[in-house]
Amino acid sequence: MKNKLIYILFISFLFTQDEIGVGLNTQDLINYLKSNYTTSSTLSYNSARDVMYGEIYNVNGQVSCFYTNFTVQNVPTSNPRPVVHAGGLNCEHLWPQSLGASSGNPKSDMHHLKPCKENVNSYRSNNPYGEIVDSQTDNWLWLNYNLSNIPNNNIEEFSESTNYLFEPREDVKGDVARSIFYFYTIYSNVADDIFFHQQKDILYQWHLNDPVTTSEINKTWLIAEYQNNIPNPFIVDTSLIYRLSLIHI
């Protein structure tokens, strides 16, 4: 009964916000989002990475791995790629390149690009996201740590991987979910359906459990400045996933 009450209160909270596409649901809302939140152009892939490393994720010259918080220091705002790459970071596509983000706008859309430690990017590969049973985790990844056994401390700071699944650290699970729902909605013509549907339910739970932060809002609007002033609508209006019926309620 308590869980049901919490769920009802959460849904009530969603609908007290300013809504995108007021009164629209399911396919009508999908069509509205495609018409109003699809960027007509993105930066080139090189330029997008420069903006990502030099501005969006650059905090006083520090750029950190999205999944592990491993940090490269002294990153310039101009031409940052050489420093970032030499420090061991590259660009992670939350929606994998091999499953729909291999070229054009889907590849360069910064709403699903993140700085990532090279080996962690490889561990993630093109695997779906999900919850991994701790005893089945192959790699525990945090900062520069790569452990094969369950950590004794700071366990929620670690991302986890197996050869078929990837679980990001707790603090970014909602960010991941909102990026994946964005990509699948906006780029449905190229997005792999199986990849999305096998993880959509857990992603919705992550969306609920890890709400939008001020930092996430600020970043999506910074990105929008380079992409036709279009933010990720799933960050702006957190009721969208529910209203789109993209998950099983």
Report the location of each language-model feature.
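Sec-dependent N-terminal signal peptides
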Residues: 4-13
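N-terminal module-boundary/linker segments of secreted carbohydrate-active enzymes
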Residues: 17-71
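Hydrophobic alpha-helical membrane context
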Residues: 14-15, 105
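Short, flexible beta-strand-to-coil junctions
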Residues: 14, 68-73, 184-187
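Long, well-ordered hydrophobic secondary-structure segments characteristic of membrane-embedded
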Residues: 53-91, 98
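Domain-level detector of nuclease and nuclease-like folds
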Residues: 81-90, 94-246
